[in-house]
């Protein structure tokens, strides 16, 4: 595939996703405004005075996400166990011991990584928009690191079995960050020019798209395959320069994509918040009405004679002396 083919793939998947974006933005706005900053990093926080979202819905969302964290992936107890194919409790003890040890190693590595804090963000997305996503990789110290991918910044497609096996995501980096990540020689002309400009190096950001999709030529034959023979392709493109800045592959699909409930044949999920939108909007509108009524009751509208302008004491318990003619 050429650069234009990857860009076309990403654009087509984004077009398919567009039908859900309005609902996602509305749910963020009325339930969890903070999530808007995740999905739209360039947006400016909106000071709605506390009347644009529901605190009750926000607390309910947090409780549901916390329940996911407590019962699905609890930090204080084992929630997964590795077993060999055809496992028998009284079978090959050496084999069973190896898998038990592997389970302990995985538990320890997850505990010292950022897995649980990132998983909390994923659960919030899952309960708010119906779809949550997390990316896993190794850092420079060969330790596990996880990244929350906010709903609205990626698009997905499924395999014939209904599993997500294709994902494209859009993100922005400054020229300085891009050079750190891939090296100056991998960057396109526009990014390199910004990198050499002291005023733009740390401030001008550029858009990139990462495409992870099945590799038709890939086979999981060993754990020492060249990138082009691994089961999944990984391509990152600079959209400003229309240039591939990084190309590699994965042995396993590196994204976890979880859906609360399914909506027909769409790869995207549906959350409880989706069905509660009408009730939440009504509650917000009612709160605004009660707020307005309270303001009107506390500070009623007054008719004043022109000659009284500036002489009426509007403070609590204030007294205004008027003439008999004005009365």
Across the structure, where does each feature detected by a protein language model lie?
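Short, flexible beta-strand-to-coil junctions
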Residues: 127-128, 136-141, 160, 211-219, ...
């Amino acid at each position: 595939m050429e650069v234009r083919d990857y860009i076309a793939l990403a654009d087509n998947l984004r077009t398919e996703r567009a039908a859900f974006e309005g609902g996602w933005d509305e749910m963020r706005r009325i339930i969890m405004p903070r999530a808007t900053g995740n999905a739209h990093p360039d947006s400016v926080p909106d000071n709605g005075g506390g009347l644009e979202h529901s605190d009750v819905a926000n607390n309910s969302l947090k409780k549901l996400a916390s329940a996911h964290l407590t019962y699905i992936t609890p930090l204080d107890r084992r929630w997964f166990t590795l077993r060999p194919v055809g496992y028998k409790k009284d079978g090959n003890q050496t084999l069973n011991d190896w898998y038990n040890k592997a389970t302990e190693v995985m538990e320890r590595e997850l505990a010292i990584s950022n897995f649980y804090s990132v998983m909390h963000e994923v659960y919030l997305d899952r309960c708010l928009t119906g779809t949550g996503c997390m990316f896993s990789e190794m850092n420079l110290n060969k330790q596990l690191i996880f990244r929350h991918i906010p709903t609205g910044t990626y698009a997905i497609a499924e395999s014939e079995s209904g599993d997500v096996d294709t994902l494209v995501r859009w993100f922005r980096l400054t020229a300085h960050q891009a050079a750190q990540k891939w090296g100056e020689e991998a960057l396109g002309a526009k990014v390199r020019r910004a990198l050499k400009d002291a005023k733009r190096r740390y401030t001008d950001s550029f858009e990139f798209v990462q495409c992870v999709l099945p590799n038709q030529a890939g086979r999981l034959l060993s754990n020492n395959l060249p990138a082009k023979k691994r089961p999944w392709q990984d391509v990152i493109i600079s959209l400003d320069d229309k240039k591939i800045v990084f190309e590699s592959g994965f042995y396993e699909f590196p994204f976890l994509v979880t859906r609360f409930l399914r909506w027909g044949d769409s790869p995207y999920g549906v959350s409880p918040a989706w069905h509660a939108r009408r009730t939440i909007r009504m509650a917000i509108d009612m709160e605004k009405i009660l707020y307005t009524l309270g303001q009107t009751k506390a500070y009623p509208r007054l008719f004043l004679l022109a000659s009284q302008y500036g002489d009426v004491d509007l403070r609590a318990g204030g007294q205004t002396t008027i003439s008999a003619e004005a009365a």
